[in-house]
Amino acid sequence: MNIKEEIHSLSEEMLTNLGRLVAIDSQLGTPAEGKPFGEGPAKALEEGLKIADELGFKTVNLDNYCGYAEMGEGDEIVGIAGHLDIVPVGGDWTYDPFKLTREGDHVYGRGTTDDKGPILEALYAMKLLRDHGVKLNKRVRLIMGCNEETGSRCMAHYNQVAEELSCGFTPDANFPCIHGEKGQLGMMAYSKNTRILSMNGGFVSNAMCDTCTTVIPAEDDLKEKLEAALSHTKLQEYKVTEENGELTIYAKGVPAHASTPHLGVNAAGVIQAESEPHGSHCSMCLLIHGTGTGYPASFDADRKSVV
């Protein structure tokens, strides 16, 4: 059996193990004793290390911040840094996000590509090297982090308590290797002139704000003007309602990862762009026509700030 045939023969086993990880809701939770990122990430780490144990690897849990599976010998360590925590799920799933679902040649579930699936791919690659007797002059250490999505405190802890890595990569992007990434800016914007009464949209900073609801004061024929303006945008859905002297604007754009904003439509950005000509309703730093990645998680009407 050649290596490609052997990889294929392991696919069912790997998918079964992926299902075990996908079934765990490993979003950032409430810290508890011995569980710095809450119950879910700790449970996912326990299961990930258990799978590695079953495959015959040495495993170590570093205080539920992260853990690792290791093979090989030598003083130098090649690190493979993945993560088991996930971003919030949202409400528009076709399939159960916590159940691995197969549809043709695709599988669906939260974490299948970011980053539970890639962790297992790396683990099974290590298994194949070991089982084929490949002798390495370095150790290979697969690190399973629990906080990549919300600050990478898992890796900060690793650097404090574990051996330094000689080199490494993360299976959390496209192949071939990417040597650098775009930067991010997290900020709070204040405005003296905004007339926004409330604004909510988005659920995580590294994803496009694909839905947004904004409330502003109603004015003569403003509802009709906004409806006409929104009809010419790339929104999937929009609705403007008027009640008790207020306009509620709902917009549904197109979701996309923050690294590929050109593939999505920012609902908050569209509302801002189309409302601005009719009054100083929004003065957020969102790129016009909804191509920016900014998102208003909440709006503080008293302080006039977008958070």
Region roles according to the model:
Residues 65-67, 146-150, 254:
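Short, internal active-site loops enriched in acidic
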Residues 46-56, 123, 130, 224-234:
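Class I S-adenosyl-L-methionine
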Residues 54-62, 102, 196, 237-240:
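Short secondary-structure junctions
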Residues 149, 155-307:
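Midchain, well-structured core segments that form catalytic/ion-binding scaffolds
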